[in-house]
Amino acid sequence: MICVEIWSNRPDFCKMLEPLHPLLRQAFDPERFLRLGQQVLQDAFQHLQDSQEKKRERSMPWTAPEEERRFWEERLSAPEGLVPLLNLVSERSNRLQDPRYMGHQVAVPFPDGALVGLITDLLNNGGAVYEMGPTNSAMEDVLMARIGQMLGLPAGCGGILCHGGTLANLVALLAARRSAGKEGVDVWSDGDDGLGAVLVSEQAHYCVDRAVRIMGWGTEGVGLVETDDRHRMTRAGMEKAMLAMEKKGRRVTAVVGSSCTTSSGAFDNLEWVADFAAQHGLWFHVDGAHGAPAAFSERHKHLLSGMERADSVAMDFHKIMGIPALCTGLFFRGQEMSFLPFTQSAEYLWSDAEDPEWWNFGKRTFECTKRMLSTRVAAVLEEYGPEIWGVLVDRLFGLGQALAELIVQRSKAGWQLAMEPEGNIVCFRYLPGDFTDTEAENAFTSNLRQKHLEQGPQYIVQTRFNGKVWLRCTLMNPLTEAEDMAALLDRLEVLAQEVQR
């Protein structure tokens, strides 16, 4: 009664509601959307064609950070509209579709992915609870179980899709921490003593170290395992690191195998890691962000022998699986294990916070709202089947071996290969003439890479390990050919002469 009296004295908001603003009408006009879409798609086609045919001067249009910021400071002060903006972004961005782009570990996406993004961005369904995105929630659960078995995990496996391998590795280690909790103690609810630890290769991606620190275990919570001359963890190194952690009073909960390392592309012997984990009662996690797709290749799946014994596996669909960033799968050998990392009350979202409802992904993910990632994965399987991942891996890994062969053929001229590549990451350097010491070699290599960055036309990066600076190629584009890689070496030889002057 009181509520009725209050509302009876309020203004008539329905009559006061203003007509739809012209800007909003314009923004939501379907016919305008169609016109813009046709133009944008035509421009995207031209960008794709020009990139594949190497029509632009450089695959990476380098500008210094401050120069690029000044450009956008001015440009964004004078808006010209959506189509001109998108064309300018395309013009000034890295051309991953150009076969001369051989830099970072980011997929050259199947062009179909842009069409998938068009629809999923328009639908914009979330995924914290089933009601926000029923289609992508159901597809995600089906796909994670099926693909997990393709990776060799047992029936009953499952997992989640998330935005990036860094997040996937963190969530996996949160599961490991909770799994290793003492009887009657729930670390999610009560915290822990801060004395946990994780063993990981000294060559592993820094995100594992970061995850351990986020969990509150600090620098001492990371047990770095020594590697051999091919950057693979050794059995003796794992035992040594375990003993060192125990002497510090640390409680090791997990060991992480790298498949493969970011800097050099080394694959840990996962059979050794699995044996070690079983011997010591540890959670066995595989950081397969880059290399786990080798499971789809008959030619290269031996690199992952032992992964089928893992408790959890992280795999980026946005690296060598042709899917736009970000899209990562975190697989658990048992679907029930995917509920370990998070349990908390959120009654307004689901009826029972402790009930393992697979359809409410907010119970299993760090993220609440996330993009419709499952549609990206499903689209590839619908159009090509999982076979395309196998042939893509074979092609990219084959390019890595071909580049290594080209480098070895020029070894007498000063070319050095860091190690024979197992995948599509190749580290090398060019040292013409005599250098006084390692410092001089490193300076020359860095200067050569900087000059190449500025002048192109290819794009590569550099890395450092064992005190030496190396040039580094990640062959991500299946359209790259042997002549493109030979042209890269030729170009570096020309630029080296300028550096030596």
What is each stretch, according to the model?
Residues 13, 17-156, 453-458, 468, ...:
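N-terminal entrance/gating region of PLP-dependent enzymes' catalytic architecture
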Residues 132-136, 159-166, 200-201, 258, ...:
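Active-site nucleophile and cofactor-binding loops and adjacent substrate-binding regions
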Residues 147-174, 223-226:
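Short loop-beta-helix segment that forms the pyridoxal 5′-phosphate
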Residues 168-340:
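Conserved PLP-enzyme active-site core in the AAT-like
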Residues 261, 305-408:
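Active-site C-terminal subdomain of aminotransferase-like
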Residues 417-451:
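Conserved PLP-binding catalytic core of the aspartate aminotransferase-like
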Residues 424-438, 457-486:
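Conserved PLP-binding active-site segment of the aspartate aminotransferase-like
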